[in-house]
């Protein structure tokens, strides 16, 4: 959800850090965990809880409420972003997790510069993205994300997007309002409410853009029809639920579907109810056909420990084994019953999509002990103390 405005100077954002950590771990677990899923239990259980309190999925198939194919974005009105003063936007609901804030030794601190690993990591090109303020919201966090495609780089900053030529850095389209992607679509998607996601489906060479809308009960997703982000898009509106607020959508690309996790709150945003995984029929969405969304329902207590889930996102050229599930990873607690563990699930949608689906807790790898920075306190900045860092 969009948040209050932020000054131009940099700030530390735990939410961005959380997304980066979980996304990286999710891909790693997806690659190492293929052999774990065949015999795993279909019940996600919190350690120490009795069998009678085990969580069980309540599967639901939800059809897209509307879909169409857009005109080429380069030919549509881009709904330019007028300059506005900094302003307040609604705060996100707070999960309310109590984190341990005391210091402890870092058992896996990096003491040497990884020159051998960075030798081949040389930026091919470096250029400025969307300029400040560049978007209407000026929100904190700005939910900045972007992806590299075959010939383009697309960046999102709450509430705008811009398409760049990745070879020259020249702007091809924008910056423009994300809502303009849904111009002429009708309904709530034309007035989205933030938390945008931009991904590049490397398997199909297509773009994915999303944001939520409709009082945090709708997820609007568009899939480009080619590798050109300025062309036409297959657009969808999914109603993810009712009687609750669905926040913090995070999406991953997988061969058999687009996977997503959201945090779920009561309608007033005062109580965290749990996390909920979803899967979208990727095959239908790539073809521009009416599509379905599949969910095992809310993963609340005792299965979820009030920590967000992150689906794995495929990047690379080596596909996972046929039928391999998508891995969802829960951020580890620094205290509590999920102590220093990346609790993990495998989500399988079946073939064809929606046939005998499973959402399964699997053996979870350990996490090194750590202290959660700025425990439970958003919008805080930490200044680096370079002089105190070890040099050998």
Model-derived segments and spans:
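Sec-dependent, cleavable N-terminal signal peptides
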Residues: 1-46
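C-terminal PAP-associated
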Residues: 39-392
